[in-house]
Amino acid sequence: MSRAALDKDPRDVASMFDGVARRYDLTNTVLSLGQDRYWRRATRSALRIGPGDKVLDLAAGTAVSTVELAKSGAWCVAADFSVGMLAAGHERKVCKVAGDATRLPFADDVFDAVTISFGLRNVVDFSAALREMARVTRPGGRLVVCEFSTPVSALFATVYKEYLMRALPRVARAVSSNPEAYVYLAESIRAWPDQAALAQQMSRAGWSAVRWRNLTGGIVALHAGYKPQPV
């Protein structure tokens, strides 16, 4: 799978991530110029979690993001539909569950907070995933979506586009076990909704008080919202 069609086959996407699992974390750090660490810390801060909270880290991959969240003292579970990615993170001692974002294997209202980092783009029906995340979150609970987005400066956006389509695939060929997956990455980022459009989708899925904050000039955006209390 090398094209960012929005009717993604979940089996193809899972297989693609299985194929990059072994060197996934290293590749991400290289391609992001080390910014991935900053984005993970910012996500943890935006979730506003602490001891006693139950947190779902969806599309957690190798669970490197889950370990960051667990620094808050919260109980965190890593969920991903790529068994290969979860297996690659076997040394990270957090709870891991294989599951589809549109059919989560959890009861209603069980998590105090849910987050998904760089995974919503890869879900065949991301609106359904947003609704499913709301289902498993308690009323008043918080969602934070960390995802690639649209740079706020036109000049920066032009430079970034060139990096995505030209430099990124070349770097990926040097460090990744499956460079074709990063062609998909670049194209899926370009096809993804901008900050305002994603906020609107979150609101439509039932999340309230949705706001976003740009990171690294808008290359990444953190979108946050709450599950409404019952009336």
Curated annotation (Swiss-Prot):
Gene3D superfamilies recorded: Vaccinia Virus protein VP39
GO biological process: menaquinone biosynthetic process; methylation
One Gene Ontology term of the molecular function aspect: demethylmenaquinone methyltransferase activity
Claim: Signal is one of the keywords in the record: no
Assigned EC number: 2.1.1.163
Ligand binding (S-adenosyl-L-methionine): 62, 80, 100-101, 117
Catalysis performed (reactions): a 2-demethylmenaquinol + S-adenosyl-L-methionine = a menaquinol + S-adenosyl-L-homocysteine + H(+)
Sorted UniProt keywords: Menaquinone biosynthesis, Methyltransferase, S-adenosyl-L-methionine, Transferase
Broad class of enzyme this protein falls into: transferase
Similarity comment: family membership: Belongs to the class I-like SAM-binding methyltransferase superfamily. MenG/UbiE family.
Function description: Methyltransferase required for the conversion of demethylmenaquinol (DMKH2) to menaquinol (MKH2).
UniProt name for this protein: Demethylmenaquinone methyltransferase
Organism: Mycobacterium marinum (strain ATCC BAA-535 / M)
